[in-house]
Design a protein with these regions (language model features):
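Primary mode marks residue(s) on the alpha4-beta5-alpha5 output face of response regulator receiver
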Residues: 1-232
Length: 232
């Protein structure tokens, strides 16, 4: 019936908090009932903590845009509105890999303006900042993507770099229609379809046609993650 969210996925994350995951706790029930919902956390910090993932009905024409009045406003677009006021906005010096803070925030999420190379606008949990900072410096040194990943893996194994926590959420926005335009990514290191009950069958084509559902990528690896396309 239409008086409740009709298609809802629930991801259990016992004892997780908004800070540890990087997700809002503002209910999206009303928005979801209108076919425009976003994931949100319920019962944070308890054994019953979970993320509600409403699957919006198919959209024939997306209303998603990555355009904004200025660089800071544009960087914040992937986030739900309640997380935007406190988010840090930054970018990297491509020659040195040093972090350049455009706006210092007080929240647990930070965003980067649209990348001129790949066109993506990204927001991430601050807990993963050391990994991104290290990667940026290695790229500035001319390291390949494979070399960067190897260095991150080695540092993690050595204990000098903390692994990405299970359940960490990141956000990605893309302005053109040849890719998934609004995508949330939930890191689930080591997870498999059997351990979390999520299909590994890609939903890219469905998402591009406005009817995407979550799916698991890189199952059973440290980089395992759930792709959550947002139909809007």
């Amino acid at each position: 019936k239409a008086d409740r969210i009709q298609d809802l996925w629930v991801m259990s994350l016992p004892n997780a908090t908004p800070e540890s995951v990087g997700v809002s706790t503002v209910s999206q029930r009303d928005a979801a009932l209108k076919g425009n919902g976003l994931p949100w956390m319920m019962l944070p910090g308890t054994p019953g903590a979970h993320i509600m993932i409403p699957i919006n009905p198919m959209v024939k024409s997306s209303t998603i845009s990555d355009q904004a009045a200025d660089e800071i406003a544009q960087a914040l677009l992937p986030l739900p509105e309640d997380l935007r006021p406190t988010a840090t906005v930054y970018k990297y010096d491509r020659k040195t890999g040093e972090r350049i803070v455009l706006r210092k925030g007080t929240g647990y999420v930070e965003c980067m303006p649209r990348d001129p190379e790949d066109g993506f606008t990204r927001c991430m949990n601050v807990v993963s900042a050391p990994r991104r900072d290290m990667a940026a410096k290695l790229k500035a040194q001319g390291k390949s993507e494979a070399e960067v990943n190897e260095a991150l893996a080695a540092a993690t194994k050595a204990g000098t770099l903390k692994p990405t926590p299970f359940g960490t959420l990141s956000y990605r926005l893309y302005g053109k229609k040849d890719r998934i335009q609004l995508l949330w990514v939930l890191s689930v290191p080591g997870a498999t379809p059997e351990s979390i009950g999520v299909s590994a069958a890609p939903q890219r084509d469905n998402a591009l046609s406005g009817n995407g559902r979550p799916w698991l990528m890189l199952p059973g690896t440290p980089g395992a993650h759930i792709m959550i396309p947002i139909n809007r």
